[in-house]
């Protein structure tokens, strides 16, 4: 299995180094749910600003403040502890009265607004995230500048970030032990983290191999394509390749790679043979996903950061802003720009 740091680059390995997360204010994330609170209902949506706190810790503290069970507080996604982040929490508090959440106090956390909402906020129920990153001590400004220009046009590999695999790859190691021993895992969180890490690692491997051996944006017979921003997909046939290639070049369509699991992967013929060969050595992880009935799915191989802009504060410091859809990783953008240094460069929740 290829480790995250050794995955194939789209734009070649960066020539320079830079410091990421010199302080939390250098990594700002603003969650975009894509909708506003209803203003009524048995749930309360709470927008918080946090610095140095992980999401679960804040959710548990909010539950304690509201005197409800921790499972009654949900969120759309985990946010980096070593960053300044805005996100929404959702608490189930039936009744007409809205508690005074301005009295909620937690070091490193501030309530920005809150309102009633009809539905529970579920994991993954967000549109995306806006990022503002500051890279410091950049050793090669020209290389970073050119890479930013290239990313605007060609995007980056849509890899799952290192944080998906746990600190030191612990989640992936857990999945491998589980696959090898077949010992039942009853902890729901461990099961979820380990299965997610296994499937994500296989996806990354397929994308890395395709980057190594072919133009990742070249449609081949049997590829599974999806409309940009949509989840559904269809299979490319030989007769359609020229027209489909035009639509891919126009960023109307995206070529996908497998998220392996039980059931059909989605590709056919040449594309299916390539995907199967790319992960042929990982029989244990594939068997684990099938055994645990994790359904196979598809994910775009390339990621195009939206609203990408940057500003050089000086020759060694650059502020970069962009928006990514839910499920995408800022670290997968940064790794195409620079070799990062810093204690928390690869760490997230």
From Swiss-Prot:
GO terms for cellular component: cytosol
GO MF term set: RNA binding; tRNA pseudouridine(13) synthase activity
Chain residues that bind substrate: 27, 129, 329
GO biological process terms, semicolon-separated: tRNA pseudouridine synthesis
Domain of life of the organism encoding this protein: Bacteria
PROSITE patterns the UniProt entry points to: TRUD, UPF0024
Stored Gene3D superfamilies: TruD, catalytic domain, TruD, insertion domain
Domain TRUD, first and last residues per copy: 155-303
Pfam families the UniProt entry points to: TruD
Top EC category: isomerase
EC number(s) reported in the record: 5.4.99.27
Reactions that this protein is recorded to catalyse: uridine(13) in tRNA = pseudouridine(13) in tRNA
Keywords: Isomerase, tRNA processing
Alphabetized SUPFAM superfamilies for the sequence: Pseudouridine synthase (SSF55120)
Active site (catalytic residues): 80
Role played: Responsible for synthesis of pseudouridine from uracil-13 in transfer RNAs.
Assigned protein family: Belongs to the pseudouridine synthase TruD family.
HAMAP family with a match to the protein in the record: TruD
PANTHER family per record: TRNA PSEUDOURIDINE SYNTHASE D
Protein's name according to its UniProt entry: tRNA pseudouridine synthase D
Organism: Escherichia coli O7:K1 (strain IAI39 / ExPEC)
Taxonomic lineage of the native organism: Bacteria, Pseudomonadati, Pseudomonadota, Gammaproteobacteria, Enterobacterales
């Amino acid at each position: 299995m290829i480790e995250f740091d050794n995955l194939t680059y789209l734009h070649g390995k960066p020539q320079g180094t830079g410091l990421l997360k010199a302080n939390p204010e250098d990594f700002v994330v603003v969650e975009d749910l894509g909708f506003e609170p209803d203003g009524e209902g048995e749930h309360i949506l709470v927008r918080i600003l946090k610095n140095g706190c992980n999401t679960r810790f804040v959710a548990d503290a909010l539950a304690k403040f509201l005197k409800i069970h921790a499972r009654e507080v949900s969120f759309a996604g985990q946010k980096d502890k070593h960053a300044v982040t805005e996100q929404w929490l959702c608490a189930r508090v039936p009744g007409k009265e809205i508690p005074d959440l301005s009295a909620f106090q937690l070091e490193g956390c501030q309530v920005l607004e809150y309102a009633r909402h009809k539905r529970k906020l579920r994991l993954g129920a967000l549109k995306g995230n806006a990022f503002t990153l500051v890279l410091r001590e950049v050793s090669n400004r020209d290389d970073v500048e050119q890479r930013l220009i290239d990313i605007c046009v060609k995007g980056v590999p849509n890899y799952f970030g290192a944080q998906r695999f746990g600190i030191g790859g612990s989640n992936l190691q857990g999945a491998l032990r589980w696959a090898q021993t077949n010992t039942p895992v009853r902890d729901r969180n461990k099961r979820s983290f380990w299965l997610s890490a296994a499937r994500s690692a296989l996806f990354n491997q397929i994308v890395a191999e395709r980057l190594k051996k072919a133009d990742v944006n070249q449609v081949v017979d049997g590829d599974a394509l999806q409309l940009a921003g949509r989840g559904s997909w269809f299979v490319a046939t030989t007769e359609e390749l020229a027209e489909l290639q035009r639509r891919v070049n126009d960023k109307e369509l995206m070529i996908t790679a497998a998220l392996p699991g039980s059931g059909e992967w989605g590709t056919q013929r040449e594309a299916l043979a390539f995907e199967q060969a790319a992960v042929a050595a990982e029989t244990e992880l594939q068997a684990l996903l099938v055994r645990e009935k994790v359904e196979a799915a598809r994910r775009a191989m390339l990621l195009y950061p939206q609203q990408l802009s940057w500003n050089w504060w000086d020759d060694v410091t650059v502020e970069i802003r962009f928006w990514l859809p839910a499920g995408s990783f800022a670290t997968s953008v940064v790794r195409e720009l620079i070799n990062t240094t810093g204690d928390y460069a690869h760490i997230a929740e």
